[in-house]
Design a protein with these regions (language model features):
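Intrinsically disordered, charged low-complexity linkers and terminal tails
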Residues: 1-155
Length: 155
């Protein structure tokens, strides 16, 4: 599928999904910094994508769901809240397969789009080229400043 195909499919997925989120993948997300954190950081303003309610510090919480990446590869991924010790953050881990790695260092700076179809099933898209990103944002009438949170769509 060409880049326009992926972009259109990602937009269609957002419009049909229950909840959607997008963010630019950071060097920390992709492991390029060599830090100890694992997986994709999910900001607190987007917790409704992966958990029904936010958690309070004191314990870790997790759940598993399938993510279908780029309309092809499926991973059983872990959504986790780290609430012990000094940590207080949400992440998505276990999202790498033999066929697709959204956390490849070459995806640093790419636009990640994650769409909840239902609580146990998600679509994931990694738009890695400027034209794909600009087309995606334009099709959903989003400003780059709106990236990093839940995508509001009209019914």
């Amino acid at each position: 599928m060409d880049s326009i195909g992926f972009t259109s499919k990602a937009v269609e997925s957002v419009r049909q999904g229950q909840c959607a989120f997008c963010k630019f993948l950071s060097a920390n997300d992709t492991g390029k910094t060599g830090g100890h954190q694992a997986g994709i950081y999910v900001p607190k303003n987007a917790v409704s994508l992966i958990f029904p309610t936010p958690f309070e510090k004191g314990a870790n919480h997790d759940r598993w769901a399938e993510i279908r990446w780029m309309a092809d590869t499926i991973t059983k991924s872990r959504f986790i809240y780290y609430g012990r010790g000094t940590r207080n953050e949400y992440r998505i881990t276990h999202c790498i397969s033999n066929h697709f790695d959204p956390l490849d260092e070459e995806h640093t700076g790419a636009l990640l789009v994650l769409v909840r179809r239902e609580w146990e099933a998600y679509d994931g898209w990694v738009l890695n080229h400027e034209d794909e990103i600009n087309d995606f944002l334009a099709m959903l009438d989003l400003d780059p400043a709106q990236v990093g949170g839940v995508i509001e769509t009209s019914p």
